[in-house]
Design a protein with these regions (language model features):
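Mixed-charge (acidic/basic) macromolecular-recognition segments
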Residues: 165-237
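Sec-dependent signal peptide cleavage junction
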Residues: 15-52
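Aromatic-patch recognition
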Residues: 53, 61-191
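Bacterial Sec-dependent N-terminal signal peptides
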Residues: 1-23, 226, 238-239
């Protein structure tokens, strides 16, 4: 009886996810799909992540503090059903490896990723070349045609006098319109008009009015129909 009891204790101790061997992967289906670490070796080829902003009133992540369902494409290979958080303060994405460890993905290897949130899919691309207007790093791609529409998210922090808090984060977003190979930051519909083909502006205005579109910087996706229509009529105009 004593021998059996000792064997049971040994099994419990060495199979516990809280054992001292932190290198042993304890895959949780609630965190990641239960395929092998070897199959995702490239995905986990990053650095161990630690939270530097525990005492901030608002988190550094986009959309949610929780890990969101998503996909990641690294060196042209796509990984599905990945749990992700997008840190828009540092412009990095992280994923849990097991119950204990979280890894920050190797940004140089990431081509693109997506997040599922509130019933919508958000697609991001990694712009790896340094360019003007802060158009680099992870950027949400809203539309791609003859022209393109992107959104860059960011959070800046401000300090706090509260001894229980290090500060808070303030989220900002910048809309980018790309046409004819040129990048334009868009602060509203009026700034968009300034970079459209002059002879098509009135037609675009008529379309917005007749379609009763509400276009606002607060809702970057509201520009999609406008840009799509502009692409259609500019295609006719230039052919």
């Amino acid at each position: 009886m004593s021998l059996i009891l000792n064997m049971l204790i040994s099994i419990i101790v060495y199979s516990s996810p809280f054992s001292e061997d932190k290198l042993t992967p304890h895959i949780c289906s609630g965190l990641q799909e239960p395929d092998s670490i070897q199959n995702r070796q490239e995905l986990y080829n990053g650095i161990k992540w630690t939270n530097k902003y525990r005492k901030f009133d608002v988190s550094q992540f986009l959309f949610s503090d929780l890990f969101l369902q998503g996909t990641v494409t690294m060196n042209s290979k796509t990984y599905d059903n990945i749990r992700l958080k997008y840190d828009i303060v540092n412009d990095e994405i992280i994923t849990p490896v097991n119950l204990e460890d979280i890894v920050q993905l190797n940004k140089e290897m990431v081509d693109s990723f997506s997040l599922q949130y509130d019933g919508r899919k958000y697609n991001f691309v990694n712009i790896k070349n340094d360019t003007l207007n802060n158009f680099s790093g992870y950027i949400q791609q809203l539309y791609s045609g003859r022209s393109s529409l992107f959104v860059k998210y960011n959070k800046s922090f401000s300090t706090s006098d509260d001894m229980n808090s290090d500060g808070t984060f303030n989220e900002t977003q910048t809309i980018y319109f790309i046409t004819e190979g040129l990048i334009y930051p868009i602060t509203g519909i009026r700034t968009l008009y300034k970079v459209l083909m002059p002879d098509l502006i009135d037609e675009v205005k008529d379309y917005i009015r007749e379609s009763r579109l509400k276009v606002s910087k607060k809702n970057p996706a509201s520009f999609i129909d406008v840009i799509r229509y502009y692409d259609a009529i500019s295609h006719i105009n230039t052919d």
